Amino acid sequence: YRENIDYGSKSLTIIGENRETTIIDGNNSGRGAELAGQSILSTFTIQNGSGNNGGNAVHASGNAILDNLIITSNSNTLGNGSVMLEANTVLKNSLIVNNQDVGVVCNGADATISNVTIASNTGAGIELKSLGGSNSHPTLINSIVYGNQDNNNIQFSAPSGHSINISYSLIQGGQDSITTYTNDTLSWGTGNLDVDPLFADTANGDYRVNVLSPVINAGHPDSTDSDGTRADMGAYPYLKTYNGPVWFVDAVNGSNFGSSGSSVNAFAAITPAIKFASSGDSINVAAGTYVENLDFEGKNLKLVGADAATTIIDGDSSGTVIRM
């Protein structure tokens, strides 16, 4: 859909069929979408938005909700964000990547950002601004901010007085990478990580995560993914489709991308089998060399190799090989 969508003063809900295939293309002639009030925009890719104002892809204000979106390949020359959030907006379950600008600008916003991946943008991942005079006080939870080309994945802008609450999120560089100014407040909560999220293939735009990723089951313990397990961080949850009680690992024929651990869809490493298994389950490991350090996580598990001579767990001289 090559158009620029403006909700005007209406509170509307617009939902696409599939976020991968239902595309709003701004045709490099303005914002992809602008909405306010109680409006909802959900399940689209928004691309090729452009302009010098805030939110070249999406500008949301009021109590608007942005849900299940892919926002990519948008450009802005003033650093006012591919997405601009104002007032009490919500951004969730969305991927914001490969934009020629800051990923998300919070402008005088008490916004909530949850289960969002913000990566590979040319500016900061998130920037707090007060272009209209009001400071920003967003909450970031269950999200990933990683690999943005500006050194600041989260950035405070003058004048001071902004605040952000971050919990159960992966922030590249961690707390020490975020510079605050006088009267700014950084609330660094529980459960945050500073590690590689192990994206599948960013060169080809695949921001799903490897089953070895530390973001799996690392979201807030009271939040869940659609499979009923503890929430992951980011826009692409790993959804459990197999429940054992026998798990399968094969270094040669298995995979750590999209695998379930079943006999026909084995993992390539032992660690994810331990992660998803329940106490009392068994893990059958095919012949091969597995370079990993294993922790049974307090579970009662049965780990069985194909043969002692050909099934090898190699700790790579980096710590205890097996903790059980």
Segments (PLM) and residue ranges:
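A short, flexible beta-alpha/helix-coil linker loop
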Residues: G51, D150, N253-F257
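Surface beta-loop-beta hairpin patches that serve as ligand-binding interfaces in beta-rich domains
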Residues: N204-W247, P272
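Right-handed parallel beta-helix/beta-spiral solenoid domain characteristic of secreted/periplasmic
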Residues: S11-N53, S75, L193-T202, N300-M324
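Predominantly extracellular beta-rich ligand-binding scaffolds that present long acidic/polar faces
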Residues: E3-T13, A57-S73, T77-R208, D227, ...
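Residue-level detector of conserved, well-ordered beta-strand and adjacent loop positions
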Residues: I15, D25, V97, V105, ...
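Right-handed parallel beta-helix/beta-solenoid
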Residues: D196-G205, Y238-P272, F276, A287-T289, ...
